[in-house]
């Protein structure tokens, strides 16, 4: 009889353990160490457009050639010849606030140069994202000051790539986080350059980071599923360059900027409204 009781208790214990184990296996927490097979891929797409109407920006080869003509809120016309920026330190935020980071602090693995002239550069995949629901995407426009301070050898692969793309001023002066160039005026005879970079420290001044932290809500909620690829399309509205929070008129005083110094109005326009999540699929 004692043996029968022991067998019954033992069997109940095994069944209870089996039930708990099965329940635990199905309890996927997107922000915390899911099993490696409970992962998906997120593809980020950056669409450079004018006034969010879905029209891609066509670059002009020179002042006289065709290109998308943008008209600012101050009724000034301009067009882009070069449109490049760096994306790094991407994070996805779950509905309950947990952050999943993608190669933060390592531009060799986690940074991308978006170049309007190269369509293949407009999107990149982020693998091994835990399954779950995500309500925000964050990234850095540029490379952080902390990463730059790690030295050239640490980030040589990406720095060499940025050199080929014209996205740095050689090592001493750091990265061009963003590079907007083009022409403006009634006959487009005037040129503008916005090269957003750090103000590197000198004996008489402190360094000022030029990278910009961007955080975007995902209103429809991104659902990452096991073994599937989910896409986030981020619209980059170039109308905000001159017609964002600040209504800017290009002139001799602001047409040629080569660091974060003097770029306050442009930075505010970029940070507050240029980037938005358009749709998912």
Annotate each language-model stretch with its function.
Residues 4, 21-22:
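Low-complexity, intrinsically disordered regulatory segments enriched in Pro/Ser/Thr and acidic residues
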Residues 1-8:
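Bacterial N-terminal signal peptides that target proteins for export
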Residues 22-281:
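A short, solvent-exposed, low-complexity linear motif enriched for acidic/polar residues
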Residues 16-19:
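C-terminal motif of bacterial Sec signal peptides marking the signal peptidase cleavage site
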Residues 11-14:
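Alpha-helical transmembrane segments
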């Amino acid at each position: 009889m004692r043996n029968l009781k022991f067998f019954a208790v033992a069997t109940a214990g095994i069944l209870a353990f089996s039930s708990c184990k099965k329940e635990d296996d199905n309890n996927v927490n997107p922000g915390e160490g899911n099993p490696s097979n409970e992962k998906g891929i997120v593809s980020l797409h950056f669409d450079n457009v004018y006034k969010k109407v879905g029209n891609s920006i066509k670059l002009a080869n020179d002042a006289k050639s065709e290109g998308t003509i943008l008209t600012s809120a101050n009724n000034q016309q301009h067009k882009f010849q070069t449109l490049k920026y760096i994306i790094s330190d991407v994070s996805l935020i779950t509905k309950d606030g947990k952050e999943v980071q993608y190669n933060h602090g390592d531009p060799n693995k986690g940074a991308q140069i978006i170049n309007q002239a190269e369509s293949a550069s407009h999107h990149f995949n982020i693998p091994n994202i835990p399954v779950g629901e995500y309500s925000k995407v964050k990234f850095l426009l540029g490379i952080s000051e902390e990463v730059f301070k790690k030295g050239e050898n640490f980030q040589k692969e990406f720095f060499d790539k940025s050199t080929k793309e014209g996205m740095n001023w050689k090592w001493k002066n750091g990265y061009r986080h963003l590079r907007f160039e083009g022409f403006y005026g009634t006959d487009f005879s005037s040129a503008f350059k916005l090269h957003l970079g750090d103000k590197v420290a000198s004996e008489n001044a402190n360094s000022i980071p030029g990278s910009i932290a961007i955080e975007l809500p995902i209103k429809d909620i991104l659902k990452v599923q096991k073994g599937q690829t989910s896409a986030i399309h981020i619209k980059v509205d170039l109308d905000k360059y001159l017609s964002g929070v600040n209504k800017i008129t290009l002139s001799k005083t602001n047409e040629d900027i080569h660091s974060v110094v003097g770029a306050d109005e442009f930075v505010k326009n970029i940070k507050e409204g240029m980037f938005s999540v358009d749709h998912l699929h």
